[in-house]
Amino acid sequence: MSFLYVCNTSSDNISKINLASFKEEIKIPLGMDKINKIGPHDLCVYNDMLLSANIYSSSLSFISLNEDKETENYFIGMHCNGVKVWQDNAYVICGETNSLFLFSLTKKKIIEEIPCGIFPHCISICEKNNLAVVANMHSESITLIDLSSKECIKNIKVQSYPTKAIFSEDGRYILVCESKMGLNKRGTLNIIDLKTLESLKRIEAGSCPVDIFLDGKYCFVSNFADGTLSIIDVNNRKEEKRIKIGGMPRGIVKSGKYIYAGDNYNNVLVQVDLIKESKKVITIGGEPTGMTLC
């Protein structure tokens, strides 16, 4: 059975969605003291645990996938935006410290800090090349990091307000979501060659693209400001289709013939059937943001 877990940032919980029935099974509450705001923002899976990077409590939560409850929580650094796991370490980016923190999942402590650009917003890892890439919103750059040496390889200048950067499945390219937030321009997907670190092509998406999900040759983009989803053919380097779903789509994933997008404005999860081009909607928590399949 497949599940989708969604961060509900303003309601301090995580929705567990049964994809077969497209129903919310449970909201998993975060905040072990039940007093302070948590703000879950990004998720990743580690063994039988779900890790949540929390922007308000500046912490990393451990959620048991078997028990559907938070079991541990550790302070990391101010404004934890994103988290990924590589070799028993959690790589957590903190927007207000402009840093990437390595948190040992065996020792349960921070073991290293790597500087990034200004206000890092997301992190992605390429296991094929032992690399990580961080999108820095306010310095309009991405930081490429060697995971083996734990050193910055290069800060690469990109266009305005990059919200996400990921690696292509073959490890040859970096795909950067350049949102151009607040500039009254359409955002772009920037394809960067990993060998030369030069831009090969910028493909226009919708207004203020904020998240991307890669499946084969297709990149699915959530356009926050115009309520649309872009489907981009990475190989042919063009936008093939744009689907109107309304609201303010934030996090996006694809499973089978469906795209799932969290509507940050209406507090709903939208399921789009790519074949029928129809949609279904269910209510979840407040301000859905990061999501992951499991």
Role assignments for model-derived ranges:
Residues M1-C294:
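Predominantly soluble domains enriched in secretory-pathway, periplasmic, or organellar proteins
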